[in-house]
């Protein structure tokens, strides 16, 4: 018998089946490779890595793929926006988000030989994977294009 029970194994295989209007969001709070400047990091992420992976994401039905680059230039903007209740500034270099209908779509993409041969190995060129963290959760949108999104 395996050291993991069926319950433990299936808990890592969650999907959103049965919830057709629910999207899942994988968020990576990313740090750049220490040897790169902010400019080099952003260039590699947006001009090299995104170009490698975006066509695969489209092919596998990924709904959205975004990056928010936090730089020396943008970080001071927070002081215009924050209040005492939310005053802790994050030190991530980038926040990357992937929105998909089912985690199986993302897993199929990651298993594609093109991903394994070109995309996955590229991470060592720009990412500090020891410091970067990830989380996954349900994606909810309340305002889009300046309009309230109708909810039940």
Curated annotation (Swiss-Prot):
SUPFAM superfamilies: Dimeric alpha+beta barrel. Pfam families: EthD (PF07110). Pathway: Pigment biosynthesis. Keywords: Monooxygenase, Oxidoreductase. It comes from the Eukaryota. Induction: Expression is regulated by the aurofusarin biosynthesis cluster-specific transcription factor aurR1/GIP2. It is an enzyme of class 1 (oxidoreductase). GO terms for molecular function: monooxygenase activity. Belongs to the tpcK family. Its EC number is 1.-.-.-. Disruption phenotype: Impairs autofusarin biosynthesis and leads to the accumulation of the intermediate YWA1. The keyword Oxidoreductase applies. Dehydratase; part of the gene cluster that mediates the biosynthesis of aurofusarin, a red mycelium pigment which is acting as a mycotoxin. The first step is performed by the polyketide synthase which condenses one acetyl-CoA and 6 malonyl-CoA units to form the first intermediate, the cyclic heptaketide and yellow pigment YWA1. The C2 hydroxyl group in the pyrone ring of YWA1 is probably formed during ring closure by an aldol-type cyclization reaction. The dehydratase aurZ then acts as the first tailoring enzyme in the aurofusarin biosynthetic pathway by converting YWA1 to nor-rubrofusarin. Disulfide bonds: none annotated. This is Dehydratase aurZ. It catalyses: naphtopyrone YWA1 = norrubrofusarin + H2O + H(+). Signal peptide: none annotated. It comes from Gibberella zeae (strain ATCC MYA-4620 / CBS 123657 / FGSC 9075 / NRRL 31084 / PH-1). Residues 34-129 form the EthD domain. InterPro entries: Dimeric_a/b-barrel, EthD_dom.
